[in-house]
Amino acid sequence: MTDNKQTVLLAKRVWYFSENDEAAFFEWLDKLPCVEKYEGRSDELEIYVNAAAADAGSVYELLALFRRYEIDMRQLRVFDREEFASWFRNRRAYWFKDIFEAET
């Protein structure tokens, strides 16, 4: 779900291997300046991202976070923008298939 600047990314059924792993997940989110807030609902976490505030570093971190915690990476297509195109659409990048070739 998106509007002009805010995007809601969904983390469904995230599996943590320990309490510290769970804490690390939320600390990681807290370090990202483009993440405005997050809210849990049942087994889903809604992550509110200010897409306009997302820079390359933030997008790289979201890619790593989503990969590490096995969150559906297809929703990161919202960052497929001209300013990131030179590296975001790199077919050899570890995220490419999960974002652009994954079944919907």
Task: Outline where the language-model segments fall.
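Histidine-anchored nucleotide/phosphate-binding helix
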Residues: 25-27
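A generic structural motif
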Residues: 43-52
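Short, hydrophobic beta-strand segments
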Residues: 4-11
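Short acidic amphipathic segments
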Residues: 29-39
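Conserved strand-to-helix beginnings and helix N-cap segments that scaffold or border functional pockets
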Residues: 19-23, 56-59
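Helix-rich interaction surfaces within compact, conserved domain-sized segments
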Residues: 51-104
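Short, surface-exposed ligand-recognition loops at beta-strand->loop->(often short) alpha-helix junctions
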Residues: 11-21
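Short, ordered beta-strand-loop transition motifs
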Residues: 1-3, 39-43
